[in-house]
Amino acid sequence: MAHVALYPGSFDPVTNGHVDVVRQACTLVDRLIVAIGVHPGKAPLFSVDERRAMIVEVFSPLAATTGCAIECVTFDNLTVAAAEKSGATILIRGLRDGTDLDYEMQIAGMNQTLVPSVQTIFIPASPTVRPITATLVRQIASMGGDVSAFVPKAVAARLKAKFSQ
């Protein structure tokens, strides 16, 4: 039986932290669905299509080297419902620190009640990427800062282009 997991997030933009979690998740599952959450109340920097393009560009080489099938979908409902709909029995959540753990434990408990067949797996971020957040990356990039240490090269180029418009 193939192990299928869903890794949800806004991915606005994809960071080296996301890459770290995907790399680790690919050692655990056969198929990883990177799921872009679309929330009408939020105003992302990058459109859904731009985020999807970044995900494909960044993760396709990783899929080729790990043998893990990586695909990208969008969802606008409950994360656990998106997992169930896509055939995933595992939710992947990255953890940077204890604050993330406290929050994610609450969500995992609620998800377990809603859809008992979907389990949450927490993946601790590697020490080098723990301080990275997409919010901080956007802020640094918007002020002309160098974000190349925090995001893949292709994403850094997209951020630079976005803020030079």
From Swiss-Prot:
Localisation per UniProt entry: Cytoplasm
Pathway(s) served: Cofactor biosynthesis; coenzyme A biosynthesis; CoA from (R)-pantothenate: step 4/5
Site (Transition state stabilizer): H18
Binding site for substrate: S10, K42, T79, R93
Cofactor(s) essential for the protein: Mg(2+)
Gene3D superfamilies reported for this sequence: HUPs (3.40.50.620)
CDD domains, sorted: PPAT
Subunit-level organization: Homohexamer.
The name this protein goes by in its record: Phosphopantetheine adenylyltransferase
